[in-house]
UniProtKB/Swiss-Prot annotation:
Residue numbers carrying Phosphoserine: 137
Extracellular domain ranges by topology: 203-228, 250-258
Protein's UniProt keywords contain Membrane: yes
Keyword set, alphabetical order: Cell membrane, Cell projection, Endosome, Membrane, Phosphoprotein, Postsynaptic cell membrane, Signal-anchor, Synapse, Transmembrane, Transmembrane helix
UniProt-listed InterPro entries: CD225/Dispanin_fam
Gene Ontology MF: a single term: glutamate receptor binding
Subunit structure as annotated in this protein's UniProt entry: Homodimer. Interacts with GRIA1 and GRIA2.
Record has Mitochondrion as a keyword: no
Tissue expression pattern: Brain-specific. Expressed in Purkinje neurons in cerebellum. Also detected in the hippocampus. Found at excitatory synapses and postsynaptic cells.
Name listed for the protein in its UniProt record: Synapse differentiation-inducing gene protein 1
């Protein structure tokens, strides 16, 4: 029975050792030796004695095995790998000894990146996609400019002022009350064709009433009708006067011949 327990413990310790080598974790077997007082470090250098770590008692043994305390010693070679596994892949930590050994024996496996700032294109050069530069002289540089005459700007301002004045005059004309043409209506009624003159006079009064009420649309309509009738009355009256005069002259001339 003791032989079976020892074989199982040896297998367990070998598996732990192999797992430590594969995963880069702490090796607890290769650098310790058993003695009467327990596990003792086999490092000859005194500075590694401070790396000794005393673990707590084991929770249980395989099938009723031993329960004595176990001392674990950190392996400096695998400690760096275990630390690196907690960082991202782009962060690599190396000791000074490893870097020094790289500089001495493995210098050919390293690559160096150099940043050159002298190839930046100047103001008189142009960079092509293939990395070549070409110098540009003052004659080759073309600067697109935009110019205009001051007179054009003045003409534009004049046009804007004329347009604004026209719009203001139109607004003022629309806001002005329509005229009644009362005098022209009275003249057409008394001196010209009086039926149309009377109608023009009536429409002029309707225009004044619409303006007093604030109905500018009706007032403008009445004003246009009064003006039309007054002009028509004057035209007809003038024609009548001319016809009467011609008839009178013809009559008088006929009597003289007799």
């Amino acid at each position: 029975m003791d032989g079976i327990i020892e074989q199982k413990s040896v297998l367990v310790h070998s598996k732990i050792s192999d797992a430590g080598k594969r995963n880069g974790l702490i090796n607890t077997r290769n650098f310790m030796a058993e003695s009467r007082d327990g596990l003792v470090s086999v490092y000859p250098a005194p500075q590694y004695q401070s790396h000794r770590l005393v673990a707590s008692a084991a929770p249980g043994s395989l099938e009723g095995g031993r329960s004595e305390p176990v001392q674990q010693l950190l392996d400096p070679n695998t400690l760096q790998q275990s630390v690196e596994s907690h960082y991202r892949p782009n962060i690599i930590l190396y000791s000074d000894g490893v870097l020094r050994s790289w500089g001495d024996g493995v210098a050919t496996d390293c690559c160096e990146t150099t940043f050159i700032e002298d190839r930046s294109p100047t103001k008189d050069s142009l960079e092509y996609p293939d990395g070549k530069f070409i110098d540009l002289s003052g004659d080759d540089i073309k600067i697109h400019t935009l110019s205009y005459d001051v007179e054009e700007e003045e003409e534009l301002q004049e046009l804007e002022s004329d347009y604004s004045s026209d719009t203001e005059s139109e607004d003022n004309f629309l806001m002005m009350p329509p005229r009644d043409h009362l005098g022209l209506s009275v003249f057409s009624m008394l001196c010209c064709f009086w039926p149309l003159g009377i109608a023009a006079f009536y429409l002029s009064h309707e225009t004044n009433k619409a303006v007093a009420k604030g109905d500018f649309h009706q007032a403008s309509t009445s004003s246009r009708r009064a003006l039309f009738l007054a002009v028509l009355s004057i035209t007809i009256g003038t024609g009548i006067y001319v016809g009467v005069a011609v008839a009178l002259i013809a009559y008088l001339s006929k009597n003289n011949h007799l």
